[in-house]
Amino acid sequence: TFGGEVIDTETGDVVWQRDADKRLTPASSTKVLTTAAATLALDENEKITTKVYRGANEKNVVIKAAGDVWMTHEQLDDLAEQISQNIDQVDGVFIDTSAWKGEPQAPGWDPENVDGGFVAPMEPAMLYGGRLGTTTGDVPRSHTPALDVAKQLGERLGASEAGMGSVAENAQEVASVDSAPLSDRAREMVRHSDNVMAEAIARELAVSRGKEASFEGDTQATLEVLREQGFDVEGVDIKDNSGLSAVSYTHLRAHET
């Protein structure tokens, strides 16, 4: 079942329509809602800063994951160089993923989507969206994307241990890198229909609205912004911001301005 609508952009007249009022599973058209909400509510120049702190053991470091799911090899090289300037020897690299809450997969996601290359478990730091063996495309994704970031940084530093950890209060910052600006990330998300990036951008929106960085918080934030901007989201029930969920429902009016 599908619904659709064609509108004359000059007159606003509807020239064709099918099931405009019917609630349907939106699939990737959900990203239209996500992009609209993020564009309306966030600064297009906003960047995500990933910081690294000295650990409780002076030869350990802890990455504070902040939501950059498209980290690059170059960023890890940069972090390693900065850390080496501050710490002579690093034995362990750990990563703190507490910035995001809740389950790593949304209600209605097919567990096979990770191995199928459509999405990774949502953790607030990933290398190239959790892709395995390459930087682009629908290739199998890691089941432990944040831990992979710690391992990759550890390899660059000659560390013998990598794992999950927490940044201690008043810990010393030893390195940081910034993501691309939101405008670039949103553009790439739409161009490639990138599910991981869509979910990550929605987490930024949730935090900006004082909500929890989780599937529940970010879907609430998306609909809240759209409602404030005059979109008809009455009856819309989305479980994610990428459209992978099989139990999300929306209608055509929500996509109209």
Model-derived features with residue positions:
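Conserved serine DD-peptidase/penicillin-binding transpeptidase domain
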Residues: 24, 40-236
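Short, conserved micro-motifs enriched in small and acidic residues
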Residues: 23-32, 143-144, 245-249
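Glycine/charged-rich beta-loop-alpha catalytic/anionic-binding loops adjacent to active sites
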Residues: 13-21, 236-237
